[in-house]
From Swiss-Prot:
GTP binds at residues 17-24, 88-92, 142-145. GO terms for cellular component: cytoplasm. GO terms for biological process: ribosome disassembly. Keywords: Cytoplasm, Elongation factor, GTP-binding, Nucleotide-binding, Protein biosynthesis. InterPro entries: EFG_II (IPR041095), EFG_III (IPR009022), EFG_III/V (IPR035647), EFG_IV (IPR047872), EFG_V (IPR035649), EFG_V-like (IPR000640), EFTu-like_2 (IPR004161), G_TR_CS (IPR031157). This is Elongation factor G. It comes from Salmonella arizonae (strain ATCC BAA-731 / CDC346-86 / RSK2980).
Amino acid sequence: MARTTPIARYRNIGISAHIDAGKTTTTERILFYTGVNHKIGEVHDGAATMDWMEQEQERGITITSAATTAFWSGMAKQYEPHRINIIDTPGHVDFTIEVERSMRVLDGAVMVYCAVGGVQPQSETVWRQANKYKVPRIAFVNKMDRMGANFLKVVGQIKTRLGANPVPLQLAIGAEEGFTGVVDLVKMKAINWNDADQGVTFEYEDIPADMQDLADEWHQNLIESAAEASEELMEKYLGGEELTEEEIKQALRQRVLNNEIILVTCGSAFKNKGVQAMLDAVIDYLPSPVDVPAINGILDDGKDTPAERHASDDEPFSALAFKIATDPFVGNLTFFRVYSGVVNSGDTVLNSVKTARERFGRIVQMHANKREEIKEVRAGDIAAAIGLKDVTTGDTLCDPENPIILERMEFPEPVISIAVEPKTKADQEKMGLALGRLAKEDPSFRVWTDEESNQTIIAGMGELHLDIIVDRMKREFNVEANVGKPQVAYREAIRAKVTDIEGKHAKQSGGRGQYGHVVIDMYPLEPGSNPKGYEFINDIKGGVIPGEYIPAVDKGIQEQLKSGPLAGYPVVDLGVRLHFGSYHDVDSSELAFKLAASIAFKEGFKKAKPVLLEPIMKVEVETPEENTGDVIGDLSRRRGMLKGQESEVTGVKIHAEVPLSEMFGYATQLRSLTKGRASYTMEFLKYDDAPNNVAQAVIEARGK
């Protein structure tokens, strides 16, 4: 089967935004204008097509990033049909993992900002993730029809808060109730969309006289940004020659692809204005799979030899599984992005991370939660496979003859955990299956059994994250659960270096004895300097401990890290240097050295100024001005560090850093302090030393 759309006409894009910036409505309009969706779904009445899980419709927030395919030939039908694969990404802090995961497989992104709220804390998180994966992006300033809408203010915030270089492609004509259309700064024409057909048709008109000066000024800014793309254009521009529309677009495209500028468009998705021109900008300025660098990976040859795959049908098949979802009718859906080659339904592929073969039974392309079965997928495609047995997020699927492991994704450690138990004993097994399924879908969610209490513990990125997991167990698996009080994921660390700590395990009880003896130094590592949070250096000279016992020493210490001596929490940022010891020809064994190492570790840890670390959250509260004092007072009582505040149209925005343990039940308290008028966002920032009194209380509560 030949390719229907050339790969240069593909756009794999994500649409990402802060909660309530109007991203779902924007996506809905895209689906409407691209002709997929004939009745526009509104989030306000829970009918949006992309939000396909029930809780999303109830809460009006987008949780699962669904992948949808649409076609676009331009507002004025000026292009050949382009295939746009849209990954919808959530805007709520607790679902940052979904954003990270979709950023990994995108080629470009549209950042949606609210014209009133501007750049919000979650926008900064998403921005950092897009930077990490070097995703070229454009911005869409939405909700221009709302009270307090201000396009150029948001452009300023993109510069100051995100450190980006925003270049407006348009200006808004009017604002709030008076918002009627946009000025196209490339063509220097006003665009007015037709309300009668929900903005499907439009007219180019002259720029309103009272906006001509402003339009000239920003047109100049656009031309200068384009001219900076190359020396030839700069010479042409400085020589007073006009740049053609084609030259301007090509130059801006080049700079967007190089991540040098962010082109900014605006509109009101709700009022059917602006999304159409933003789609044109996606085609004009965002990359196709062939415009982005080849994907890097390593060969599965035991040597981790670097390799790459180019976006071409002629290269061996390689794809990355970026999301697992459970579908009530067909079971497991594995969403994957094809980076190279072609695969047909019925083909056998290799999961190179797990070295297991998988058969592609059925392949479907998703339109939100409707699916269309297809026979093959090619480089650049995003699709879902039904019935893969053992594939997890981040696994590589590839041609068995040409194995490669594509870059793995990194997932954050959970910061909050709660105990769960089924309401009826009979549901115990069902609950285990449900939690296993959900953990497979979401790598930032963990499940384990507490060895001491035998309780099932679930852990995630925040209270809302865990609420939704419990909710999904009830809806999708029919398991009702009781949940315990949230527990904070503390950590333990040391603050001083200790040297020559001895650990000796010697036993003689008739017959063969046990003998292991080690001498170690322990030292703190700079937080975040080592991804594992642990390093082991073997400095044994002259064979005082034979080489075969060294891994046992390392293992003995690593086993102790899982449950630290202070309060049984994991130990992080620790370095160990093994430099002396002794052994016995007959009595020494791996077990004896493992035990000797654990004795030395416990001894050294006590002497190395041990501390308890607590998770600190970055909290931003938006409150009416008259409640500012109360809100700040309350944050201080919660051991919050005030980091600053600024005035907004809607009130005051307060920035603080607060320990997670003090934030439980904050939503309720904030509601009563401000009569429900304030809102807040919270995301994990860092681990920091807990004050003595807090640490003492935690240690006593753990019975250590």
